[in-house]
Regions:
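Primarily the dimerization/phosphotransfer
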Residues: 11
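Active-site-adjacent helix-turn-beta-strand microarchitecture at beta-sheet edges
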Residues: 136
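Nucleotide/phosphate-binding catalytic cleft detector across ATP-hydrolyzing
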Residues: 1-8, 16-132, 140
Length: 140
């Protein structure tokens, strides 16, 4: 089965597509667009130009995933939208333009997902994972 994830970060938006069969996960697509959403935040408010950039990129990636008939498309946002005061306005704008709005995840959930992904692909038994993002840093 195919799965797609659109990760909306403070600096980039990434589309990842995976094939999952019999417990094996094979990455198929890894596409990134550097949009610099953090640069569109003024006094804690994302300005309309930033909303437009986010919506265009999410919409393009969502269309790519739908064109592959991927049944499960997850769209997540991290600190890029977690920390803005006009979060609801931004989500509404993205939903209207792109047809889908990201789920905003907490820093704790972001760290949990980092851990799951990293331990699967890196086969780590012990260690520390540091995810240095544009708007937050998680330690696992």
């Amino acid at each position: 089965m195919l799965y797609a994830v659109i990760d909306v970060g403070s600096n980039s938006v990434r589309l990842s597509v995976y094939q999952c069969e019999n417990g094996n996960i094979q990455p198929l697509i890894d596409k990134k667009d550097t949009v610099g959403l953090a640069g569109y935040v003024e006094n804690g408010i994302m300005v309309e130009e930033g909303m437009k950039k986010a919506a265009e990129t999410i919409g393009n990636f969502y269309t790519i995933a739908r064109n592959f008939n991927i049944p499960s498309i997850s769209v997540f946002a991290t600190a890029s939208l977690r920390n803005v005061a006009n979060q609801e306005e931004v989500l509404r704008y993205i939903r209207e333009y792109a047809g889908v709005a990201p789920e905003i995840i907490t820093g704790e959930e972001e760290a949990r997902l980092d851990f799951i992904g990293s331990t699967h692909f890196l086969k780590m038994e012990r260690g520390i994972l540091v995810d240095i993002g544009g708007g937050s840093t998680e330690l696992v």
